[in-house]
């Protein structure tokens, strides 16, 4: 979706080159903290943005905005014949692909399992180890993945029977994946993606201005139309 948003932005700003870097929000945050050049951070969760803003003091004041909401879905590959219908009987899977707790989709999956009464509540669900999740699901084998793309790939290729990803991750894979359950916000909480301009001492004034302009475009109606088409929920409060 972001590639298409960038293309749309370049229709009116052809002289601006936006170079996206895709990975889990935790990995991207770590790269920024380690000094990687970055002008804009678009996170799949509030936690990483909170860290960048409050702990690292690297968010430009007044530039943080909520862009989209997303939903966690339980997926399987076409023709899997799985007995799983959703989180409530996830234990019936032969094996599961699941992101670790440091990855937003892994955190939201754990939160949903806590709220569904499958996992015990803890102060920070992102700290729940994958082996504890496995035990709560009757010892089912879990393939711990480093990011949501890895989960999607493992299930689409049939390496794992089921997995949890974002609804938007199923875009373009409708012929390979079946959605078993769209997990309600009541279980996961909101899955808000915030965006902000990042303080970058290496950027000149023109680059900083372009970064802010791009942030503002991402929350525009033109960008929302694109996000909607990729199964994101754009009905969010800023």
Where are these regions (language model features)?
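Exported/periplasmic ABC-transporter solute-binding proteins
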Residues: 1-13, 26, 33, 46, ...
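A generic structural motif
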Residues: 13-20
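Central helical "cap/lid" subdomain
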Residues: 56-65
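Ligand-binding clamshell of periplasmic/extracellular solute-binding protein-like
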Residues: 20-30, 37-53
């Amino acid at each position: 979706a972001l590639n298409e948003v960038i293309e749309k932005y370049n229709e009116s700003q052809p002289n601006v080159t936006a170079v996206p870097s895709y990975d889990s929000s935790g990995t991207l945050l770590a790269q920024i903290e380690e000094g990687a050049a970055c002008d804009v951070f678009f996170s799949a969760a509030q936690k990483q943005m909170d860290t960048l803003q409050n702990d690292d003091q690297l968010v430009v004041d007044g530039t943080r905005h909520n862009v989209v909401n997303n939903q966690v879905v339980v997926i399987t590959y076409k023709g899997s014949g799985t007995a799983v219908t959703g989180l409530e009987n996830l234990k019936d899977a032969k094996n599961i692909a699941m992101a670790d707790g440091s990855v937003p989709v892994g955190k939201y999956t754990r939160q949903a399992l806590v709220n569904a009464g499958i996992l015990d509540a803890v102060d920070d669900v992102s700290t729940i180890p994958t082996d504890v999740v496995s035990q709560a699901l009757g010892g089912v084998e879990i393939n711990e993945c480093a990011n949501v793309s890895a989960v999607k790939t493992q299930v689409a290729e049939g390496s794992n029977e089921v997995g949890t990803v974002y609804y938007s991750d199923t875009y373009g894979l409708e012929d390979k994946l079946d959605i078993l359950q769209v997990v309600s916000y009541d279980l996961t909480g909101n899955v808000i993606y915030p965006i902000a301009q990042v303080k970058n001492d290496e950027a000149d004034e023109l680059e900083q201005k372009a970064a802010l302009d791009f942030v503002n475009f991402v929350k525009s109606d033109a960008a929302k139309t694109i996000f909607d088409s990729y199964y994101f929920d754009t009905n969010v409060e800023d």
